Amino acid sequence: MSTIVKICGLTTADTLEAAVEAGADMVGFVFFPASPRHLDIDFADALGRQVRSRAAKVALTVDADDDLLDAIVEQLRPNWLQFHGSESPERVRSIKRIYGLPVMKAIAVAGPDDLSVLPDYAAVADRILFDARPPKDATRPGGLGAAFDWKLLDGVNLKLPFLVSGGINAGNVAEALRVTRAQGVDVSSGVETSPGEKDPDLIRDFIRAARAA
């Protein structure tokens, strides 16, 4: 299976087109007001229509309530839901049942103890995303450009695909994939010139490097 490449936090038509044309498998739209990549649903819908069927549309939320999820699913019609908050395994199972959509659950990693929740989430999610645990004073759970110790994933043996994120860019994506043996990578800040400002050239460089890894 080829490496799954996800570009997350896209906010403009130009950067979305760069990601899709370069061969991204998944494109992520963020629905979390504290993030500089936050989109309102109407604009996300316009970007989603631009994607057509060229990549999977991923709706990223953080502890979203049912009303927000209803609106996102009805208007954007995403292919995937990504949960980046403290959603419980029971919540993941319930939402999958309600919407009939696959779910990718992010697990924040700083040390080995953070992996203790993995079996419970692996039993209900369709993909797992390992991301760096943010500082306690952070206002958002991801997209901070911080990496975790990839060697912590030594011995992780999942029956479902998993992706890695956090501090990954074109210069280190090959090493991230080699060390973690992940089936995919998810990048946001690693293809930006400033928070929320994606760069088409950095997107293309990242996808090229991930494919060559």
UniProtKB/Swiss-Prot annotation:
GO terms for molecular function: phosphoribosylanthranilate isomerase activity. It is an enzyme of class 5 (isomerase). The keyword Magnesium does not apply. InterPro entries: Aldolase_TIM, PRAI_dom, RibuloseP-bd_barrel, TrpF_fam. Pathway: Amino-acid biosynthesis; L-tryptophan biosynthesis; L-tryptophan from chorismate: step 3/5. It holds the Pfam family PRAI. GO terms for biological process: L-tryptophan biosynthetic process. Keywords: Amino-acid biosynthesis, Aromatic amino acid biosynthesis, Isomerase, Tryptophan biosynthesis. It catalyses: N-(5-phospho-beta-D-ribosyl)anthranilate = 1-(2-carboxyphenylamino)-1-deoxy-D-ribulose 5-phosphate. HAMAP family: PRAI. Belongs to the TrpF family. This is N-(5'-phosphoribosyl)anthranilate isomerase. It comes from Rhodopseudomonas palustris (strain ATCC BAA-98 / CGA009). The gene is trpF.
